[in-house]
Amino acid sequence: MAKSLRSKWKRKMRAEKRKKNAPKELSRLKSILKIDGDVLMKDVQEIATVVEPKHCQEKTQCVVKDETDDMKMETDIKRNKKTLLDQHGQYPIWMNQRQRKRLKAKRERKKGKSKVKAMKAAKGLTW
């Protein structure tokens, strides 16, 4: 379905508006975080000791690296790279119906040609 000029224009104008308002939005968000952050930090400091952010980042990076090593996904889906079919004969989710139909027809044409060749070869041998 084609995109109308109106929708293209509206999208363009929204993008320009976002560019124009981005600095204001950023400063507003920063001010909100600054106000709320100070209040929370004061409450936390009364209860417990606060660690500097650099130490926290280093520790979390080490923990994240360890977790990623352990979490390797095992995919049970095995695909034929040439036909893109999996072991159950299903195409990938991202492939649209027209592509699926086209590939299926192409595959059937190849099967038909091989059957015809086999029939001709068999006829040639029988006489």
From Swiss-Prot:
Q: Which domain of life is it from?
A: Eukaryota
Gene Ontology process terms (BP) = dendrite extension
Glycyl lysine isopeptide (Lys-Gly) (interchain with G-Cter in SUMO2) cross-link: located at 65, 72
Molecular-function GO term, any one = basal RNA polymerase II transcription machinery binding
Ranges where the record places region Disordered:
1-24, 98-127
**GO CC terms of this entry:** chromosome; nucleolus
From the Swiss-Prot or TrEMBL record, state where the protein is found. Answer: Nucleus, Nucleolus; Chromosome
Q: Where is the composition biased (Basic residues)?
A: 1-21, 98-120
Quote the InterPro entries the UniProt record gives: LLPH-like (IPR018784)
Print the keywords alphabetically: Chromosome, Isopeptide bond, Nucleus, Ubl conjugation
Instruction: State whether it acts alone or in a complex, and with which partners, per the record.
Output: Interacts with CTCF, MYO1C and with the transcriptional machinery, including RNA polymerase II and TBP.
Cited function: In hippocampal neurons, regulates dendritic and spine growth and synaptic transmission.
Which family is annotated?
A: Belongs to the learning-associated protein family.
Q: Which PANTHER family match?
A: PROTEIN LLP HOMOLOG
Mind telling me what this protein is named?
A: Protein LLP homolog
Organism from which the protein derives: Bos taurus
What does the organism's lineage look like at the top? Eukaryota, Metazoa, Chordata, Craniata, Vertebrata
Gene behind the chain? LLPH
